[in-house]
């Protein structure tokens, strides 16, 4: 994953490769927000629909119902902004080798959490700035860095 790879290299002052010149966006989500979404979903399991029609099936209301949710921050962040926050929190800047978009990569992705918000009241609570700060603190402690 990009956060760990970037943290590893930035913490050591090593150059990093930045795809799409850092312009693409991703939905960086703090782990506690993901856990919160999972727990909320577990506390609200899908229920069978007594009017389930086998001729016009809807798997979300069958006798074995399920729901699929996106869990994320619902706030896309440009990769370069994420890298800047890592550098700020590690207290150093590194050389960025800017690369073009790679084959098969997508310019922007983020989670639409509207169904999870509607069904279980999920709302991510950790802004990217706070999440990166906590991630770097954890990273330093875990890997014995100051």
Regions found by a protein language model. Give the residues of each.
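C-terminal substrate-binding subdomain of Rossmann-fold SDR/epimerase-dehydratase oxidoreductases
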Residues: 8-146
């Amino acid at each position: 994953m990009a956060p760990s790879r970037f943290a590893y290299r930035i913490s050591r002052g090593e150059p990093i490769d930045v795809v799409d010149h850092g312009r693409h966006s991703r939905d960086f989500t703090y782990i506690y927000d993901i856990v919160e979404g999972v727990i909320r979903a577990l506390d609200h399991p899908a229920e069978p629909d007594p009017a389930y029609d086998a001729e016009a099936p809807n798997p979300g209301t069958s006798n074995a119902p399920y729901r699929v949710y996106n869990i994320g921050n619902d706030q896309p962040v440009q990769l370069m902004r994420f890298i800047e926050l890592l550098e700020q929190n590690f207290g150093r800047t590194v050389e960025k080798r800017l690369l073009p978009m790679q084959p098969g990569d997508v310019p922007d992705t983020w989670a639409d959490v509207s169904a999870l918000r509607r069904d279980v009241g999920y709302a991510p609570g950790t802004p990217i700035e706070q999440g990166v700060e906590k991630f770097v603190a954890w990273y330093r402690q875990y890997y014995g860095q100051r």
